[in-house]
């Protein structure tokens, strides 16, 4: 009986979270215009590209593996770099703490529109223990993978910023086009008025 009650409560919890739009942690509601795109990378099977691909799929984005498609938006990974800086040292001068930095540069290409550059910087602090060299290397690799995953999440989130900028540009172009049409119409009306003013008055013969 207790088992049935627990199962019922669990089912209700699932329904409630589904009804309120609950999403998995780290996922992003990508706009429909960007839910199908190309993923371009010079290292398509590298750990960073794999993390980005996984994050896109978690966000319900369909990745089209056809570079000949020019009608779809594209997320292009320009490059990435990792730096390691010393933050603190022991009394004997040996490094005690590092800061790991991951820089990622990318672009979003919208067909027939603009190219939007994206930059992501991820920081992590790593404590160096010279007595546990093997554990240190394993921990550093775990941190680097976490940084790649976080960079992938931020890249996908910035698709929302790109979409907002695209809407703003479309509105501004529409306003500019409307203003241009109005100016053209006013100029035509002025030409018509000038022509009418320049015409001599036509007199009607008296009967």
UniProtKB/Swiss-Prot annotation:
Lipidated sites in chain (S-diacylglycerol cysteine): 20
Location of the protein in the cell: Cell outer membrane
Signal sequence region: 1-19
GTP-binding recorded as keyword: no
Gene Ontology BP term (one): lipopolysaccharide transport
NCBIfam families: PRK10796.1
Gene: lptE
Membrane topology note: Lipid-anchor
Ranges annotated as spanning the membrane: none
Annotated coiled-coil segments of the chain: none
Keywords from the UniProt entry: Cell outer membrane, Lipoprotein, Membrane, Palmitate, Signal
InterPro entries in UniProt: LPS_assembly_LptE (IPR007485)
PANTHER family: LPS-ASSEMBLY LIPOPROTEIN LPTE (PTHR38098:SF1)
Family designation: Belongs to the LptE lipoprotein family.
Designated name of the protein: LPS-assembly lipoprotein LptE
GO terms of molecular function: lipopolysaccharide binding
GO cellular component: a single term: cell outer membrane
Organism, as annotated: Yersinia enterocolitica serotype O:8 / biotype 1B (strain NCTC 13174 / 8081)
Lipidation (N-palmitoyl cysteine): 20
Domain of life: Bacteria
């Amino acid at each position: 009986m207790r088992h049935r009650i627990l199962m019922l409560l669990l089912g209700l919890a699932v329904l409630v979270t589904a009804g309120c739009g609950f999403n998995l942690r780290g996922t992003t509601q990508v706009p429909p215009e960007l839910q199908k795109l190309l993923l371009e990378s010079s290292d398509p099977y590298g750990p960073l590209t794999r993390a980005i691909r996984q994050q896109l799929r978690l966000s319900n984005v369909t990745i089209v593996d056809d570079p000949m498609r020019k009608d779809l938006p594209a997320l292009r990974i320009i490059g990435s770099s990792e730096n390691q800086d010393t933050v603190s040292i022991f009394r004997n001068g040996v490094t005690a703490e590092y800061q790991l930095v991951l820089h990622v540069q990318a672009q979003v290409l919208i067909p027939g529109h603009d190219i939007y550059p994206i930059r992501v910087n991820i920081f992590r602090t790593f404590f160096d223990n010279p007595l546990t060299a093997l554990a240190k290397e394993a921990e550093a690799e775990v941190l680097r993978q976490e940084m790649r995953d976080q960079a992938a999440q931020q890249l996908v989130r910035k698709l929302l910023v790109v979409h907002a900028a695209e809407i703003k540009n479309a509105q501004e172009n529409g306003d500019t086009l409307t203003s241009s049409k109005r100016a053209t119409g006013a100029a035509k009306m002025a030409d018509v008025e000038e022509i009418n003013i320049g015409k001599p008055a036509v007199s009607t013969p008296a009967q």
